[in-house]
From Swiss-Prot:
This is Mitogen-activated protein kinase sty1. It is found in: Cytoplasm; Nucleus. The active site is at D141. Belongs to the protein kinase superfamily. Ser/Thr protein kinase family. MAP kinase subfamily. HOG1 sub-subfamily. ATP binds at I26, G27, M28, G29, A30, F31, G32, L33, V34, K49. Its EC number is 2.7.11.24. The modification Phosphotyrosine is found at Y173.
Amino acid sequence: MAEFIRTQIFGTCFEITTRYSDLQPIGMGAFGLVCSAKDQLTGMNVAVKKIMKPFSTPVLAKRTYRELKLLKHLRHENIISLSDIFISPFEDIYFVTELLGTDLHRLLTSRPLETQFIQYFLYQILRGLKFVHSAGVIHRDLKPSNILINENCDLKICDFGLARIQDPQMTGYVSTRYYRAPEIMLTWQKYNVEVDIWSAGCIFAEMIEGKPLFPGRDHVNQFSIITELLGTPPMEVIETICSKNTLRFVQSLPQKEKVPFAEKFKNADPDAIDLLEKMLVFDPRKRISAADALAHNYLAPYHDPTDEPVADEVFDWSFQDNDLPVETWKVMMYSEVLSFHNMDNELQS
């Protein structure tokens, strides 16, 4: 039986195993508090997130279960990895992940990025997305603050709010809206993995320009800014809009012509412009895939088809539609924690 110690962080009781020491708060979100800590077993610095009251409602219990299942499934060099998980005597859940030094948002607000860094960061983002998408998973919330980077420029997509949480002191925090694909923003249709390619394209453009590409004040303004660059959506896209109100809104807008990307991104490499144009396409069916983007000439310095893996199996979403009581989710969660430690022990033996 693991031994637990208690400590107060920001008025919150952290009840963690003796394996972790030197807790320091690094962020707080709606669902939990994150601290950096020293892992006594490995000597590494880690991030420890406490999930607040995971079993207080069926919705929270299901959300926590989903996040754990996803992190266990998505094992890849460019995705944040789960190194430990435990449930305290108070029945709070703690996720332990790698700790990386910074994130892309902080980098972008501190200095312009040189071309080789833009290429390398984009390559790693797309390499991670290729794996995520092959597992039948959509990130849905890709943005610079969800992309963690260490001193070696290794990049990891921080998925599902489980790793580093937004620093409350961070200035100039950018809304998720800036990176949201039009088909999500205007609820046109059932969206798919292409929404992540749009977000990655927005991040790519921001790395080139040093500022957000589509900084909308609200969804209407956001859409207007997008059309100023991409022009009016083509008819085959407008025809897919299910909402009558959204359809009326889009049809009421004045016709706009697409601005040539070479004109917008005057100092960008022609290959960068070509790839960006393939990522930022109104019609999700015509957006380039992560796998094809990796093979684009712009990423040739890093592209290695033998080292861009896909998932062994598609993620099992069968639990998603289950409407279960908290106690059932709790039993399922304990089972997942147990299987994680059994799997971890097998890997180490």
